[in-house]
Design a protein with these regions (language model features):
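Amphipathic alpha-helical polymerization modules
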Residues: 1-135
Protein backbone atom coordinates (compact mmCIF):
# COMPACT_ATOMS: atom_id res chain seq x y z
CA UNK A 1 0.00 0.00 0.00
CA UNK A 2 2.82 2.43 0.85
CA UNK A 3 4.26 2.04 -2.66
CA UNK A 4 1.14 3.72 -4.07
CA UNK A 5 2.11 6.97 -2.36
CA UNK A 6 5.79 7.05 -3.41
CA UNK A 7 5.18 9.49 -6.29
CA UNK A 8 3.45 11.85 -3.85
CA UNK A 9 6.39 11.69 -1.45
CA UNK A 10 8.88 12.42 -4.24
CA UNK A 11 6.82 15.38 -5.44
CA UNK A 12 6.17 16.69 -1.92
CA UNK A 13 9.85 16.64 -1.02
CA UNK A 14 10.70 18.24 -4.38
CA UNK A 15 8.17 21.00 -3.66
CA UNK A 16 9.86 21.73 -0.34
CA UNK A 17 13.30 21.72 -1.97
CA UNK A 18 12.19 24.11 -4.72
CA UNK A 19 10.58 26.38 -2.11
CA UNK A 20 13.91 26.62 -0.30
CA UNK A 21 15.64 27.28 -3.64
CA UNK A 22 13.17 30.09 -4.47
CA UNK A 23 13.68 31.64 -1.01
CA UNK A 24 17.46 31.49 -1.49
CA UNK A 25 17.20 33.16 -4.90
CA UNK A 26 14.93 35.85 -3.44
CA UNK A 27 17.53 36.48 -0.73
CA UNK A 28 20.22 36.82 -3.40
CA UNK A 29 18.14 39.38 -5.29
CA UNK A 30 17.24 41.27 -2.11
CA UNK A 31 20.91 41.56 -1.13
CA UNK A 32 22.28 42.62 -4.52
CA UNK A 33 23.47 45.93 -3.00
CA UNK A 34 24.38 44.70 0.50
CA UNK A 35 27.93 45.84 1.14
CA UNK A 36 28.15 44.37 4.63
CA UNK A 37 27.12 41.09 6.20
CA UNK A 38 27.38 39.52 9.67
CA UNK A 39 30.35 37.48 8.38
CA UNK A 40 32.11 40.66 7.27
CA UNK A 41 32.43 41.95 3.74
CA UNK A 42 29.63 42.04 1.19
CA UNK A 43 26.78 39.54 1.06
CA UNK A 44 27.81 36.36 -0.76
CA UNK A 45 25.45 34.83 -3.29
CA UNK A 46 24.10 31.47 -2.17
CA UNK A 47 23.08 28.41 -4.18
CA UNK A 48 21.12 25.31 -3.19
CA UNK A 49 22.49 21.81 -3.82
CA UNK A 50 19.98 18.98 -4.19
CA UNK A 51 20.34 15.27 -3.63
CA UNK A 52 17.94 12.41 -4.11
CA UNK A 53 17.56 9.91 -1.34
CA UNK A 54 16.42 6.33 -1.07
CA UNK A 55 16.28 5.16 2.52
CA UNK A 56 14.27 2.09 1.65
CA UNK A 57 11.61 1.11 -0.90
CA UNK A 58 8.99 3.22 0.86
CA UNK A 59 11.02 6.34 1.60
CA UNK A 60 12.36 8.18 -1.44
CA UNK A 61 12.52 11.85 -2.31
CA UNK A 62 14.59 14.99 -2.72
CA UNK A 63 16.73 16.66 -0.05
CA UNK A 64 18.74 19.83 0.16
CA UNK A 65 22.29 18.52 0.60
CA UNK A 66 23.70 21.97 1.39
CA UNK A 67 23.51 25.66 0.65
CA UNK A 68 26.83 26.90 -0.68
CA UNK A 69 28.25 30.40 -0.98
CA UNK A 70 29.43 31.54 -4.39
CA UNK A 71 33.21 31.85 -4.58
CA UNK A 72 33.23 34.65 -7.18
CA UNK A 73 35.08 37.72 -5.92
CA UNK A 74 32.99 40.79 -5.09
CA UNK A 75 32.58 43.65 -7.57
CA UNK A 76 34.67 46.69 -6.71
CA UNK A 77 33.11 50.10 -7.34
CA UNK A 78 34.95 53.35 -6.75
CA UNK A 79 32.90 55.42 -4.31
CA UNK A 80 35.07 57.06 -1.64
CA UNK A 81 32.04 58.69 0.01
CA UNK A 82 30.42 55.31 0.79
CA UNK A 83 30.67 54.30 4.48
CA UNK A 84 31.96 50.82 3.49
CA UNK A 85 34.67 52.12 1.15
CA UNK A 86 38.17 50.76 1.73
CA UNK A 87 41.25 52.97 2.12
CA UNK A 88 41.51 53.29 -1.68
CA UNK A 89 37.87 54.41 -1.99
CA UNK A 90 36.51 51.14 -3.40
CA UNK A 91 33.32 49.50 -2.16
CA UNK A 92 32.89 45.72 -2.45
CA UNK A 93 29.46 44.72 -3.75
CA UNK A 94 28.06 41.19 -4.07
CA UNK A 95 28.85 39.59 -7.40
CA UNK A 96 25.18 38.88 -8.16
CA UNK A 97 23.78 38.96 -11.68
CA UNK A 98 20.07 39.76 -11.31
CA UNK A 99 19.31 38.38 -14.79
CA UNK A 100 20.93 35.07 -13.83
CA UNK A 101 18.94 35.05 -10.59
CA UNK A 102 15.67 35.74 -12.43
CA UNK A 103 16.39 32.86 -14.85
CA UNK A 104 17.08 30.61 -11.84
CA UNK A 105 13.84 31.80 -10.23
CA UNK A 106 11.84 31.02 -13.38
CA UNK A 107 13.47 27.56 -13.52
CA UNK A 108 12.63 26.90 -9.86
CA UNK A 109 9.06 28.11 -10.39
CA UNK A 110 8.60 25.78 -13.37
CA UNK A 111 9.96 22.85 -11.36
CA UNK A 112 7.59 23.73 -8.51
CA UNK A 113 4.62 23.94 -10.90
CA UNK A 114 5.57 20.63 -12.53
CA UNK A 115 5.51 18.91 -9.14
CA UNK A 116 2.14 20.49 -8.31
CA UNK A 117 0.80 19.19 -11.62
CA UNK A 118 2.18 15.73 -10.92
CA UNK A 119 0.45 15.68 -7.52
CA UNK A 120 -2.86 16.78 -9.08
CA UNK A 121 -2.62 14.16 -11.85
CA UNK A 122 -1.71 11.43 -9.38
CA UNK A 123 -4.57 12.44 -7.07
CA UNK A 124 -7.01 12.33 -9.99
CA UNK A 125 -5.67 8.98 -11.17
CA UNK A 126 -5.90 7.55 -7.66
CA UNK A 127 -9.51 8.80 -7.29
CA UNK A 128 -10.47 7.18 -10.61
CA UNK A 129 -8.83 3.93 -9.56
CA UNK A 130 -10.80 3.97 -6.30
CA UNK A 131 -14.00 4.68 -8.23
CA UNK A 132 -13.34 1.63 -10.43
CA UNK A 133 -13.02 -0.59 -7.37
CA UNK A 134 -16.44 0.60 -6.16
CA UNK A 135 -18.21 -0.76 -9.25
Amino acid sequence: MEEMFLPLNVSATALEAQKIRMNTIASNIANVNSTSSPEGGPYRRKDVMFESYLYDESNVGVNISKIVEDERPPKKVYDPSHPDADKDGYVSYPNINTIEEMVNLIDATHAYEANLTLIAVYKDMFAKTLALTQI
